[in-house]
Amino acid sequence: MPSSPSSTTPAPTSTPAARREPSGKGPSGAAARLFLPLIALCTAVTAANIYLAAPLLPLIAHDMGSTPSAVAWLASVAQLGYAAGLLFFAPLGDSVNRRRLVAALSLVATAALLTAAASAGTGALAGAVLVASAATVVPQLLVPLVAERAPADRRARHVAAVIAGLFTGVVAARVLGGLAGQAFGWRAVFVGAAVLTAVLGLATAYILPVERRQRRGPLFAGLVAIPGLVRRSPDLWRACVRQAGMYGAWSALWTSLALLLTEGEGYGMTTAAAGLFGLFGLAASVVAPLAGGLVDRFGAAKVVRSAYALAALSVPLFWLGGQVMAALCAAAVLVHAALVASHVANQTLALTTTSAPATANTAYVVAGFAGGALASALAGPAFGHWGWGGVCAVAGAWLVLGWTATAVRPARSARSARSARSVRSVRSAR
């Protein structure tokens, strides 16, 4: 594993499906100054779409004549849709015009969100959420672009700025979504999200650099290349598995939190009050720039180890938080700090370990969201059968799996270091 992502030399691969012309025209003037802030804002809005349903579950259940725990699977549908969109659309960032792709996906997501707002049943709502989430892959098309354009010694910090936008969107979905849902109804929240997605998605597409690309090979060559790319890169594989464990633990806890906070057996809060709890997620937005600096300085491995230690500490605090609000608040801060630090480190590594950053980023994010979707799917039944303690058990199991599974395949740098020490020992013996 590279000691610092900013100094990594991408390994050669045969993945790229397009030849990039060097004459691409980038943003200039005011557009250049707005480039990173607008991308971060667009990332926040589009990321929020994936999590809109979670804080609105009690309102959706009431409107559909059901219970919150019975419709909790909608949160998993959103994450599965996002993972599917990543598989099919994110690899296209290496082979097609990103301006057109961002604009098209933004319009598809807008239409799906409006359809969700008009849904008469959970089946139709789930279908609309699935499509909206699949089209909400714009952030993962933009992160590789930001990494490409950033100076080498500030790459992780620029990536961290976009990730800070992503987690701000997650917080906004819970806080503002809960408040707006309580005031205007859950359907109005989806309409508002559709408007913001259209405006910011098209604005972001407008300021993206003009790219002249000549595609070679099938359109979805990047998708086909993912398994081989992960197999050839131990560093990428390690980042994928560890983030799947971390994101799965966070997802199990965070998507089930509304059930603990709003149901009578828990804290019995209103949807609006429970949504305010999402403000603790702002810890992620604060930690992201700090984590970027730490990755640039100390390398990804140390940051990921520290993040896993924080997450492991948060799980017993979450369990205690089933009865003690102070413990729940502390755990929420810790798990968000752990998630974003791990994400910045692992994603920077994924973007710099191969010569096909969009495809590598797809593999990384799909792994994370697949882990999150599966953990969320298990957390709902766990809450129904064993209460909040069952959810905490799912989160703990995901952390253990994410860490121990990577121990059987050391990273490239670790193997290289051991080989170098062996060579030096032999030479000194001679």
Swiss-Prot record:
Coiled coil: none annotated. It is a multi-pass membrane protein. It is found in: Cell membrane. Keywords: Cell membrane, Membrane, Transmembrane, Transmembrane helix, Transport. Residues 1-26 are annotated as: Disordered. Pfam families: MFS_1 (PF07690). It comes from the Bacteria. The chain crosses the membrane at residues 34-54, 70-90, 101-121, 126-146, 159-179, 188-208, 244-264, 275-295, 315-335, 362-382, 383-403. GO terms for molecular function: transmembrane transporter activity. InterPro entries: MFS, MFS_dom, MFS_trans_sf. Induction: Transcriptionally regulated by SCO4008. Residues 1-17 have a biased composition (Low complexity). Its main location: membrane. The keyword Transferase does not apply. GO terms for cellular component: plasma membrane. The keyword Nucleus does not apply. Belongs to the major facilitator superfamily. This is Probable transporter SCO4007.
